[in-house]
């Protein structure tokens, strides 16, 4: 009887785990360039990453986050969140102790 009870509990736990695992919906677009850079990283990710609007805390060391909204996140981003819109609006939620270089010139583009 105890063995049957353990089997039932294990089956229920496995079913709940699989249900929770398959219920997660991920809205992702396949970008071959970011896929290749994730698989074969050569250290250029940080060099190619950029941010026009970077916010930092006043703590020492500062905690900085890029608040740019774009169609895709840069290749060095680990936590990219995209809105369900067309075109997609994505924002990187990584935090660092520094800001990336600016993507555009500080002059207003026409």
From Swiss-Prot:
GO terms for cellular component: extracellular region. PROSITE patterns: BOWMAN_BIRK. Residues 1-28 form the signal peptide. Pfam families: Bowman-Birk_leg (PF00228). Gene3D superfamilies: Cysteine Protease (Bromelain) Inhibitor, subunit H. InterPro entries: Bowman-Birk_prot_inh, Prot_inh_BBI. Residues 29-42 form a propeptide. The record marks 84-85 as: Reactive bond for chymotrypsin. Disulfide bonds join 50-103, 51-66, 54-99, 56-64, 73-80, 77-92, 82-90. Inhibitor of trypsin and of chymotrypsin. Belongs to the Bowman-Birk serine protease inhibitor family. Monomer. This is Bowman-Birk type proteinase inhibitor. It comes from Lens culinaris. The lineage of its organism: Eukaryota, Viridiplantae, Streptophyta, Embryophyta, Tracheophyta.
